[in-house]
Design a protein with these regions (language model features):
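Blade-level signature of beta-propeller repeat domains, shared across WD40, Kelch, NHL, RCC1
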Residues: 704-734
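Secretory targeting and sorting signals
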Residues: 1-32
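Surface-exposed loop and turn segments in beta-propeller and other repeat-based domains
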Residues: 44, 92-98, 137-151, 193-205, ...
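A short loop-to-beta-strand structural motif that recurs across blades of beta-propeller domains
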Residues: 77-79, 122-124, 179-182, 229-231, ...
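Short, conserved, GDST-rich strand-edge loop motifs in beta-rich repeat architectures
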Residues: 270-281, 514-525, 574-591
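Repeated scaffold domains used in trafficking and secretory/extracellular systems
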Residues: 49-59, 99-108, 150-161, 205-213, ...
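Residue-level signature of beta-propeller blades and closely related beta-rich strand-turn architectures
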Residues: 73, 120, 174, 225, ...
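Conserved beta-propeller blade signature
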Residues: 66-70, 113-116, 167-171, 219-222, ...
Length: 734
């Protein structure tokens, strides 16, 4: 009888010890994982070809006419071009490192200084006579009176014009609507003054003002992305009138990119991408007071400008100018509205060079530039000649590209990395890492023009997703990486409604799942299945995708797929919140979704809302054991595919945030590596702690530079980018 009693006591002690151990495991703080690696910056990569969307002109203090050519990118590259001798006078960085410079349009002040409206949200004033390093001043600065009151409206600047009083008008884009900002450089004893010309925005519900034109006290603004309008504003009273523009003028356009006004004519660019003749041949001529189409001999006036901007010329009261291919020869054309005729002013311009609103420096000197290759065309009207800048032994005309922020990054079999940049370019960056970081090798490889939003690859294919053309460009995969010689392309949709192929995930050796989004922030995205072997694509817009359960119909509408993972003939897709993706309401109806798509039946089989208060499911990945992981930027979680439920979950309430943009997540040897809130974080797959930040964002005077574009190299190290630099996180040996 005594033995059983002893056994009972031992059993009770064991139970007590087990209970204590369990309690400690629950209450004791988990130790954050530390991979023990180190971060290394790879050498500075070569820049891509120059991005020159526009050019400016002015004269030096000695009267020399010059072109102001800025290559966009990280800090930008400022070139001063002598238009008389057709030579490059100087070249220097425009702005400090980590300044996003996108030179969309220029205008000239009466003091010969040039203004640059940058897509990075800055208005620069450039003095070409100033010493090196002192030529550019950023006027979009809190030290300028009124700027802090308008800063929220100036996230992106599209256009700039100047009136006869040197007052500056800037077209902007922002989440708070499209605005026109006015800057008066002479106010406040030369410190300037910023104001919002039309408080509340120019057009309700539209996020951008894309184009401006000014003449004789009236400002004209092309606004909208879904509903396009032209607004006429009296700059003395700020009274605004919407013009009655014929519907066919704006039909099919995503923006009103080009306006010009001269001598009682309002020129409106209408070019729609494609090979068909655009409305009015590219430019419609309207009455600037009413919006009615101008007529000549009973017929509408039309200019065959195709995609060219119509520009004015000093000393010409009525004529306007544009460039166009004539008999396969690039020409500069002069249009006289009095006779409704055009004549060739010069031939032999660079084929890609396009005019800007201030291309004419004088009545004799004209300059235009190629947006994506830096080619230059300088015209001397007096002898009707056109020429580029002199080329060196390497074929360069001296217009040098700027470093640019890395947009996307991937590692391929064989060990190389491929990267793309922010803003379009006809090339990719190939990186060959080395254990000794200073022996890293780079090369620039030719690729179709575009901005690569996403990469995907299998053992047989390398796929790139191109913006703004909305197409996939595919290369065969060789033993040492992709063979770049013979790319093939396919449009995701025939109507170009899906333009950003963000996410490309292999299903098998030949097929890929592709998640795409439309041009604007609003609107539904699409899920596509791409067969690379056949170069065929099937696209399923989320607004009308098929559901296995009819009761789910509509649950994905007005959302965009940002993350995809493939698991056992199913795709698990994470979306944005509905509408603009910001989920201000934080409701079930607006929240982001996670859905399951059957690759065989091409139907959505299950849908869930993991978190009502988040903006998107930014990344999904599959672990080595088949577990599915995801993140929203704040939450990290697992997904149980069997019953389609959320398993483990952890909220990083202190260092995470609900993100609206796609990111990346990788599982390596039982550890999750995810970009969250602009940081690279290592987390245990148990999700028992907040993990460890192994690569943080960097604070600079120009703002934060975030970590992005995470990929796992063939060497099993992590690679990612901050700005224009690629970094490696090297793990300890063994």
């Amino acid at each position: 009888m005594r033995q059983p009693a002893r056994t009972t006591i031992i059993t009770l002690w064991g139970a007590l010890i087990t209970a204590l151990a369990l309690a400690l495991s629950i209450t004791a703080p988990a130790v954050a994982i530390d991979p023990g690696g180190r971060e290394e910056a790879l050498p500075t990569p070569p820049p891509p070809k120059p991005s020159v969307p526009s050019v400016g002109t002015t004269a030096l203090s000695d009267g020399t006419p010059v072109g102001i050519v800025v290559a966009g990118g990280d800090g930008g590259m400022l070139h001063i071009v002598d238009l008389s001798t057709r030579t490059l006078r100087s070249r220097e960085r425009l702005a400090p490192e980590n300044t996003d410079v996108q030179p969309w349009e220029f205008a000239r002040l009466s003091n010969r200084h040039v203004l640059l409206a940058s897509g990075g949200g800055q208005l620069f004033e450039i003095d070409p006579d100033a010493p090196e390093g002192k030529k550019a001043t950023n006027l979009s600065d809190p030290s300028r009176p009124g700027y802090e009151q308008v800063a929220a409206y100036s996230k992106f600047l599209w256009d700039v014009v100047v009136d006869e009083h040197d007052r500056v008008y800037v077209a902007t884009q922002s989440d708070r609507g499209g605005h026109i900002l006015r800057y008066d450089p002479s106010a406040n004893q030369g410190r300037g003054q910023w104001t919002d010309l039309l408080p509340g925005g120019v057009q309700a519900g539209q996020t951008e003002v894309r184009s401006l034109a000014y003449d004789n006290g009236f400002l004209y603004a092309g606004t909208g992305t879904k509903t396009l309008s032209i607004v006429r504003i009296n700059t003395s009273t700020n009274a605004a009138t919407k013009l009655s523009v014929p519907s066919h003028v704006t039909a099919g356009l995503g923006h009103l990119e080009r306006l010009q006004v001269k001598a009682g004519n309002l020129y409106v660019g209408t070019n729609v991408p494609g090979n068909v003749r655009p409305t009015c041949g590219g430019t419609c001529v309207l009455d600037p007071a009413t919006g009615a189409q101008k007529m000549k001999d009973g017929k509408p006036i039309e200019l065959d400008t195709w995609s060219s901007q119509v520009v004015t010329r000093p000393g010409e009261a009525e004529k306007v100018y544009y460039t166009v291919q004539s008999a396969n020869t690039p020409t500069l054309q002069e249009y006289d509205p009095r006779t409704n005729t055009s004549r060739t002013l010069a031939e032999g311009l660079a084929s890609t060079a396009r005019p800007s609103q201030s291309s004419w420096a004088t009545h004799d000197h004209f300059i235009s530039a190629g947006k994506d290759d830096g080619s230059i065309a300088i015209v001397h009207a007096s002898d009707r000649s056109a020429a580029d800048l002199p080329k060196d032994a390497n074929g360069s005309n001296g217009i040098r590209g700027s470093l640019r922020s890395i947009q996307s990054l991937t590692a391929v079999p064989g060990g190389d990395l491929y990267a793309s940049w922010y803003m379009t370019t006809p090339m990719l960056l190939r990186t060959t890492p080395n254990a000794q970081v200073d022996k890293t090798q780079y090369s620039l490889t030719t690729a179709p023009l575009g901005q690569v939003e996403g990469f995907g690859h299998s053992s047989k294919w390398f796929v790139t997703g191109i913006y703004p053309s909305g197409e996939l460009v595919t290369y065969e995969m060789g033993a040492n990486g992709p063979r770049m010689e013979h790319p093939r392309s396919v449009k995701i949709t025939t109507d170009a409604s899906q333009v950003r192929p963000y996410t490309i995930v292999p299903i098998d050796a030949d097929r890929f799942a592709v998640g795409t989004t439309p041009m604007g922030k609003n609107g539904s995205g699409a899920l596509s299945i791409y067969d690379a072997a056949r170069n065929e694509i099937s696209t399923y817009p989320l607004d009308d995708i098929a559901y296995a359960d009819p009761s789910l119909r509509g649950s994905l509408s007005n959302r965009r797929p940002l993350s995809i993972v493939h698991h056992k003939d199913k795709l698990y897709v994470g979306t944005s919140a509905s509408g603009d993706g910001m989920n201000a309401a934080q409701t079930e109806a607006a929240a982001p979704r996670l859905f399951e798509f059957d690759v065989k039946t091409k139907q959505v089989t299950r849908v869930m809302t993991p978190f009502k208060d988040q903006r998107s499911i930014t990344a999904l990945t599959s672990g080595s054991d088949g577990t599915l992981y995801g993140t929203t930027g704040m939450h990290v979680f697992t997904v149980n595919p069997t019953d389609f439920t959320i398993g483990r979950s952890r909220a990083l309430t202190r260092q995470g945030y609900a993100d609206a943009n796609r990111s990346q997540m990788i599982e390596r040897d039982g550890v999750l590596y995810a970009i969250m809130a602009g940081r690279l974080r290592a987390l245990s797959t148990s999700l028992q702690d907040d993990g460890t930040v192994i690569a943080d964002f960097v604070n600079t005077p120009q703002g934060k530079v975030y970590v992005n574009s995470l990929t796992l190299g063939a060497d099993r190290n992590l690679y990612y980018a901050r700005g224009a630099t690629i970094y490696r996180y090297t793990f300890p040996a063994g």
